[in-house]
């Protein structure tokens, strides 16, 4: 009556269970290696819970799925910056992401947010490059150029350490 219920011994079954637990615990490190030399894993599909960024009942103030190791603070070797898995920087690789303000020269004093607002402005003298410009277009363009030069000089004066102060008085 005594038949073997399992084709393997209980010790072998325990060993297989330990291997299975070890593989499932190492699975995130297998698909996202910590060092960039161990493989290019940036284009791999993320798991569902990796798409949530600090979401959940017990995640108040906690980074739940971040992996800490010696190389970087978040376990990824992506140029030493914080890599948020919920916002993959390679998701728009096939779509051109250059905007109009990206094509402006680097010597321009506008910051990126100012450039975005510069592009969105309409109905002002910044919209002079449209074809429906009025007759006094050259005068308005000259006024705009003068105001930009004045703004650049003001910015240079702000960035210079303790230069001459300008006092403006208004006479009534």
UniProtKB/Swiss-Prot annotation:
Name the GO cellular-component terms: extracellular region
Main localization (coarse): secreted
**Any one GO biological process:** sleep
Keyword Secreted assigned: yes
Question: What's in the keyword line of the UniProt record?
Answer: Neuropeptide, Secreted, Signal
Q: What modifications follow translation?
A: May be processed by convertase egl-3.
Q: Does the keyword Cell membrane apply?
A: no
Subcellular location as annotated: Secreted
What is the residue range of the signal peptide feature?
1-26
Superkingdom assignment: Eukaryota
- Job of this protein: Neuropeptide-like protein. Plays a role in behaviors associated with a sleep-like state induced by stress (SIS), acting in concert with the FARP (FMRFamide related) peptides, flp-13 and flp-24.
Q: Under which name does UniProt file this protein? A: Neuropeptide-like protein nlp-8
- Naturally occurring in which organism (per UniProt): Caenorhabditis elegans
């Amino acid at each position: 009556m005594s038949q073997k219920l399992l084709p393997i011994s209980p010790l072998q079954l325990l060993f297989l269970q330990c291997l299975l637990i070890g593989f499932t615990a190492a699975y995130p490190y297998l698909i996202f290696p910590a060092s960039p030399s161990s493989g290019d894993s940036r284009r791999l599909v993320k798991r569902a819970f990796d798409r949530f960024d600090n979401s959940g009942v017990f995640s108040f103030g906690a980074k739940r799925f971040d992996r800490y190791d010696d190389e970087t603070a978040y376990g990824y070797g992506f140029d030493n910056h914080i890599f948020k898995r919920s916002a993959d920087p390679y998701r728009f690789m096939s779509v051109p992401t250059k905007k109009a303000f990206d094509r402006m020269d680097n010597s321009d004093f506008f910051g990126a947010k100012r450039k975005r607002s510069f592009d969105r402005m309409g109905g002002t003298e910044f919209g002079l490059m449209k074809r429906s410009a009025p007759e006094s277009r050259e005068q308005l363009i000259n006024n705009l150029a003068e105001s930009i030069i004045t703004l650049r000089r003001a910015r240079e004066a702000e960035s210079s350490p303790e230069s001459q102060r300008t006092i403006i008085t208004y006479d009534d």
